[in-house]
């Protein structure tokens, strides 16, 4: 397993929480339009937006990058497998690696997990003590 894949590894409970948050995003959007948005809705919306912004997808131009992020989001929102999404501009394995990275960023921005940068700082701090 490569270092990039290990970097975005989430435990099963965290994966379920993040997928449920993204899966319920359509309901959150309806509440927002109706003016009944909760604080958690705002936090979840911001976390999803930040995750989309954090996705690097090296080798893609901006249009292809936005398309790929849209497909990743659609896959999680509607629980659709790669095979049902149509044109994704990448192979199945790479798509699921990107999807895992997206879930990691959502969890990180919601505060469910500690970010990689913060985690490495904590390790460095412990090493110096």
Language-model features and meaning:
Residues 60-80:
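Short amphipathic alpha helix immediately N-terminal
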Residues 78-91:
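Helix-turn-helix DNA-binding module
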Residues 95-109, 113:
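DNA major-groove recognition helices of helix-turn-helix
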Residues 5-8, 88-92:
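Short, aromatic/basic-enriched loop-to-helix "N-cap" motif that marks the start
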Residues 58, 90-91, 103:
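Generic recognition of cysteine residues
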Residues 1-62, 114-129:
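N-terminal interaction/assembly modules
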